[in-house]
Structures are given as C-alpha cells and as structure tokens.
C-alpha cells in the first residue's frame, strides 16, 4: 500500500507532504536540526525537479524505508510518519491524475479538461463499490467533477447453461483452449455479439465455432472468390473506375447498404454499444454481401473481357471488402488486418488507417427498401417451399402477396428479381386481408429497449389485437407515448 505522507510529533504538530521535492527539503531541515544524520534521498542521487523515470528509480518510498525518515516540526520537535497506509482504492481512484504525474507535469490535461473526465471506462459489476466509486469520490472532492462520462459494467461469464463456472463443478472453460482451437478473433467477436456487455454471458464453445464458421468463414470465402477472379483478370483497384451513377442498380444498392452500415456502426460505437455494432457488420456480411450480392452477381465475374460491367462488379466488391476490414478492426483486430493487407491496403496495417466515414451521396433509402422487400419475400417463399417439400428447381405458376400501396411500389420494382430467385412465373397481389389471418409476434429484445418495465404489459395487449387493430398498427405504428399503449 501507499504510506500516508503525514508526519506528526508527540505534541500533535503535523505536516502533510505533497511531493517528493517537498519531502527532500523537509529532510534537509531535519538533518540541520540533528534528527537525521543525512538525507537518504540525496545519498541515493535523487535530484529534486528532475521528473525522469531514471531519477525516480533511485528511491523507494514504501515501507519500511519511508518510516526511517524523521522530520522536524515548526517548534523543533521530531515528527514520525503515521503508521497507517492509504487504502489501495485511493490509488485506483487517483488513476486519472497519477498516470500523467499530475500536478507536477501535464497540468493542462486535467486543468483544461483535455484528458479529464474520461470519456469511457469499463470494469466488472463488482467494481460498483470499488473503482467506479473511488474515481468519482476523489474527483468530486478535488475538482467538484465526475471522473468519467460513460461506463460499462461488465456482466459475468457463465457456462452454457447459465451456471457460475467452478473448478469444483468442472464447468470452467479455459480461454486459452478456446483461443487455440477457434482463434482470438472468433472468441472476441462471439463475446461481443452474443449478449450486451452489461449482461451475463452464457459462454458456449459451439457458439464460438458458429461465429468462426458462419462469419469469418463467409467473409474469407467472399474474399477468396474476389481474389480468384481478380488475379486471373489482373484487376487493379482504382484504375479506370466506373462512375457511381453508371453502375448497375445492384452495385448501387450494396454500396448504399455499405454506407448505411458505416453510419449505423459508428452511431452504435459512439453510443458505447459494441454488441449492436458487431451484429450489424455480421448481418451485412452474411445477408447482404455474401448471400445476396455475390450470389446474384457471380456470372459478372466470369466474362473473358474486362467490360465496364465487370469492372464495376470488381470495384464494388473490392470497396465492400476493404471497408468491412476497416469497420471490423476494433472487433477482430487480427483477421481484419490480414484481410486489409491481402487487399493491398495503403497503410502497413488496418489499425494505422482511418475508420470509415459514410458518404451520404451514395445512400439511397428507397433502393434499400425495395431490395430489402425482395430479400424478405424471397426468404419467405423459399421457406414455404421447404415446408411443403417443393424443390426450387420445380417452377410454380404464381405467388400471392398481401401488400400496402407503398409495398406494392417497392415490389413492382424488383418483381423480376424475386420471380427469378424463387422460380415462379407470376407475382400477384392480394387485395384486402380477407383471406389472411395475421398474428403479432413480439421482438422482446427491441421492445425491452423501447418500453423497459412496461414490456410485458405491451406484449400482453399486442397478443390480443384484432385483425383491424393489427392493420391499424401496421399503418400507424406504435404511439410515441409508450404509456398510451398500456
């Protein structure tokens, strides 16, 4: 522990030392008064005012050495140091100042608030009465200020069944075994995206393996597809770029999604929510980039000549992969760096490059909406085929879709794409909802954020909505005043 820097005489006189230089000078007075034979700081070569690490390495102010120092009071009496030590939480709470040697150096960092209060800190929930408290306590006493602006109090890591890990029970998961088996990035991304950091995490090795296969495997395969054909064609990014406005709609769509992704990920990170940010990247890579864009555009990479259409496909996919490598860097620092360098990034490392910023001019919300409609309808039709065991290769005459006027507009724009994907000849709209019975299924994760403790009451009411009420809800949405729905 840190010795209390207080010396007191038997008569009650005392002095609180505020710096090593002050202690040095007080020892000199004690030597002159005959209470000390010599100044141990001077004997060890310490030079007051020299803030170098080398200078401070010469002395040790821990016990028992500091207890040998006798000071002299103003009345000429000997003073001995108080025997108590400062609680270690005082040391921890002094971190913002001690780490920069304030107030002896770097005064502007604290006084002009360049590095204080901290933007963000993170520790386990057990630190609520420890570090979190002492940081604020000391900052309030000294500066009448909070010590930090944002905090994430991490939950506990439990086993896959939600039980506390225990060596006695035998359910402890060795993190080094997980890293060795699945890789550091897979473990990191799993832990960040599986649950919010402030919630307890049910750690399941199968979940880590799923992240490794479904996310990193998909991203690697997407890069491999690009690299295979790019190397054959001698594609060089940045040469003879196709103007954005002249690119096919599918290219403009994925680039719009990419820039929307940048906006959303940045917003979530600035809001200190890495879980939602990581899930957004995962959804883009798996759903939009791999399962939709690359799958629908494979043939564009197969042509023998480097046509404008083929070059546009290369440029678009390259931009997506390069941007994802930079977006992914905080979540998966190793693979993102590998991907960045494989793509020929300008910097020596992705971590030396700037984090992506969205280009608003490339975002087309209307285009994204109608393509999302195509994805949803395709997914539902294919799911229905699987349910009734009708293979995709077997053509069907028509599909019937209930839709609002706005939805019809979007669907008409991507009608041919949908029909081709699901192998159906006609797409017809259902007028009215007479033949449909709709049910409300609540997304509790989303509702929890919106309604909090009111969520159960809202869910109970929504489960009992009539067909007319459901239609009204679809058209008008949930009221802004959340209490009005309870």
Predicted stretch roles:
Residues 114-115, 263:
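Residues forming anionic-ligand binding surfaces in small-molecule and nucleic-acid pockets
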Residues 1-90, 94-96, 102, 142-180, ...:
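Feature 926 captures the class I aminoacyl-tRNA synthetase adenylation module centered on the KMSKS loop
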């Amino acid at each position: 522990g840190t010795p209390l820097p207080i010396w007191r005489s038997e008569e009650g006189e005392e002095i609180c030392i505020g710096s090593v230089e002050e202690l040095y000078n007080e020892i000199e007075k004690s030597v002159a008064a005959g209470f000390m034979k010599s100044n141990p700081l001077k004997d060890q070569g310490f030079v007051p005012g020299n803030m170098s690490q080398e200078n401070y390495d010469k002395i040790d102010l821990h016990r028992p050495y500091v207890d040998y120092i006798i000071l002299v009071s103003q009345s000429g009496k000997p003073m001995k140091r108080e025997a108590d030590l400062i609680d270690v939480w005082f040391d921890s709470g002094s971190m913002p100042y001690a780490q920069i040697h304030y107030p002896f150096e770097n005064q502007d960092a604290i006084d002009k608030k360049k590095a204080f209060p901290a933007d963000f800190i993170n520790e386990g929930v057990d630190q609520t009465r420890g570090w979190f408290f002492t940081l604020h306590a000391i900052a309030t006493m000294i500066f009448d200020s909070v010590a930090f602006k944002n905090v994430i109090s991490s939950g506990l890591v439990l086993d896959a069944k939600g039980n506390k890990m225990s060596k006695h029970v035998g359910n402890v998961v060795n993190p080094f075994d997980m890293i060795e088996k699945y890789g550091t990035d897979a473990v990191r991304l799993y832990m960040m995206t599986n649950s919010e950091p402030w919630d307890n995490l049910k750690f399941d090795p199968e979940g880590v393996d799923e992240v490794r296969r479904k996310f990193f495997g998909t991203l690697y395969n997407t890069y491999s597809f690009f690299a295979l054909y790019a190397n054959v064609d001698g594609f060089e990014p940045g040469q003879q770029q196709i103007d954005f406005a002249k690119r096919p709609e599918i290219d403009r769509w994925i680039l719009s999604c990419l820039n929307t992704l940048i906006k959303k990920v940045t917003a979530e990170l600035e809001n200190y929510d890495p879980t939602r940010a990581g899930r957004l990247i995962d959804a883009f890579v798996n759903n939009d980039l791999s399962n939709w864009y690359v799958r629908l555009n494979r043939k564009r990479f197969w042509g023998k000549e480097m046509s404008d259409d083929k070059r546009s496909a290369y440029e678009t996919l390259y931009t997506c992969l390069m941007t994802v490598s930079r977006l992914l860097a905080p979540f998966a620092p190793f693979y993102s760096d590998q991907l960045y360098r494989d793509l020929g990034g300008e910097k020596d490392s992705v971590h030396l490059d700037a984090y992506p910023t969205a280009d608003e001019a490339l975002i087309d919300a209307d285009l994204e909406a109608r393509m999302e409609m195509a994805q949803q309808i395709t997914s539902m039709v294919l799911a229905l085929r699987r349910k009734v065991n009708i293979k995709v290769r077997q053509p069907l005459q028509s599909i019937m879709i209930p839709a609002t006027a706005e939805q019809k507009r979007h669907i008409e724009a991507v009608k041919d794409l949908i029909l081709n994907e699901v192998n159906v000849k006609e797409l017809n709209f259902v007028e009215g909802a007479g033949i449909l019975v709709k049910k409300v299924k609540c997304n509790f994760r989303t509702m929890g954020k919106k309604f909090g403790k009111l969520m159960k009451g809202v869910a109970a009411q929504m489960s009992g909505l009539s067909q007319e009420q459901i239609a009204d809800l679809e058209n008008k949405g949930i009221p802004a005043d959340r209490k009005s729905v309870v």
